[in-house]
């Protein structure tokens, strides 16, 4: 892959990518490019140096911030490194992710050339809006007539039987604010003095479903009788009050119609990412996978 400003490829390990940082690393002034190989968060380093896990974290971030259904982005199509990801064209993103491909491609291009270490700065500069077509009753009626599941608490369609149709209907990009023509003084000031990211081993108020489950297990005094450890050393746990957990998650996500059936369906999304595992033959029993963090007793 040819990088801007690089005329000769140097194969000497002593002068490799850790010493020859391309021009786009200027957008990450407080970041150590090499730290991508040692567990740093995805927004702290340039996408070129993401691990496969950091690619997945980026995809999860887009799902969460844009309130997309998990089926909109097929994670199995992105079991790749950051270098591979950065080499993909818009057409390749579209083939891999369908209607979500444009969102992923546009988001990645912004990160590559205008990225900041702080995810908050990134979100303010790159405004991706996902909206529903609820203003057109005929569209909503068509979805209902075709037996798609409609969740009024979200004001949008969720858990559609045809996820591809759902994603095509849901994803709407705002292009006017993606790449500003001229930088304002405030934006320039933010780029010159980026907000430092303070990372922790785990966030006690995790925004992901698996983190929410983990945090209940880690705080049994605050959430008694909901979930219990079956084998803490192996990361195995059981739902005691599955519907109560679902209602708590629904409250967190402003979805009053959340049920355990929907919750368990969302949990399956973490299987391929090896964050959660289903324990065969045991109802309501799950296990944290090798990519889940913050649940072990010896983790700080």
Curated annotation (Swiss-Prot):
The keyword Protein transport does not apply. Its main location: nucleus. Residues 29-115 form the PNT domain. Residues 207-289 bind DNA. GO terms for cellular component: Golgi apparatus; nucleoplasm. Coiled coil: none annotated. PROSITE patterns: ETS_DOMAIN_3, PNT. It comes from the Eukaryota. It holds the Pfam family SAM_PNT. Residues 181-203 are annotated as: Disordered. InterPro entries: EHF_SAM_Pointed_dom, Ets_dom, ETS_fam, Pointed_dom, SAM/pointed_sf, WH-like_DNA-bd_sf, WH_DNA-bd_sf. Keywords: DNA-binding, Nucleus, Transcription, Transcription regulation. GO terms for molecular function: DNA binding; DNA-binding transcription activator activity, RNA polymerase II-specific; RNA polymerase II cis-regulatory region sequence-specific DNA binding. Residues 185-195 have a biased composition (Basic and acidic residues). The keyword Transmembrane helix does not apply. It is found in: Nucleus. Transmembrane segments: none annotated. Transcriptional activator that may play a role in regulating epithelial cell differentiation and proliferation. May act as a repressor for a specific subset of ETS/AP-1-responsive genes, and as a modulator of the nuclear response to mitogen-activated protein kinase signaling cascades. Binds to DNA sequences containing the consensus nucleotide core sequence GGAA. Involved in regulation of TNFRSF10B/DR5 expression through Ets-binding sequences on the TNFRSF10B/DR5 promoter. This is ETS homologous factor. It comes from Mus musculus (Mouse).
């Amino acid at each position: 892959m040819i990088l801007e400003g690089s005329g000769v490829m140097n194969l000497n390990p002593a002068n490799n990518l850790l010493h020859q940082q391309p021009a786009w690393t200027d957008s990450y002034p407080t970041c150590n490019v090499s730290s991508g190989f040692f567990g740093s968060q995805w927004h702290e380093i340039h996408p070129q140096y993401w691990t496969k896990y950091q690619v997945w974290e980026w995809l999860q971030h887009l799902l969460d911030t844009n309130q997309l259904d998990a089926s909109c982005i097929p994670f199995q199509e992105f079991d790749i490194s950051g270098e591979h990801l950065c080499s993909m064209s818009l057409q390749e993103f579209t083939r891999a992710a369908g209607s979500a491909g444009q969102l992923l491609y546009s988001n990645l291009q912004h990160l590559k050339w205008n990225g900041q270490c702080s995810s908050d700065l990134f979100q303010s500069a790159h405004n991706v809006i996902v909206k529903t077509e609820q203003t057109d009753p005929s569209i909503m009626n068509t979805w209902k007539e075709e037996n798609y599941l409609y969740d009024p608490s979200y004001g949008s369609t969720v858990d559609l039987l045809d996820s591809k149709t759902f994603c095509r209907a849901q994803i709407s990009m705002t292009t006017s604010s993606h790449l500003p023509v001229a930088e304002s003084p405030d934006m320039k000031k933010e780029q010159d003095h980026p907000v430092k990211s303070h990372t922790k081993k785990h966030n006690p108020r995790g925004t992901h479903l698996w983190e929410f489950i983990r945090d209940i297990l880690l705080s049994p005094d605050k959430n008694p009788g909901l979930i219990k450890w079956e084998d803490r050393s192996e990361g195995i746990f059981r739902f005691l009050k599955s519907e109560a957990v679902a209602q708590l998650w629904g409250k967190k996500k402003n979805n009053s119609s959340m049920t355990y059936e929907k919750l368990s369906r969302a949990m399956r999304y973490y299987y391929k990412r090896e964050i959660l595992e289903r324990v065969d033959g045991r109802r309501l029993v799950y296990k944290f996978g090798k990519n889940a963090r913050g649940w072990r007793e010896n983790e700080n």
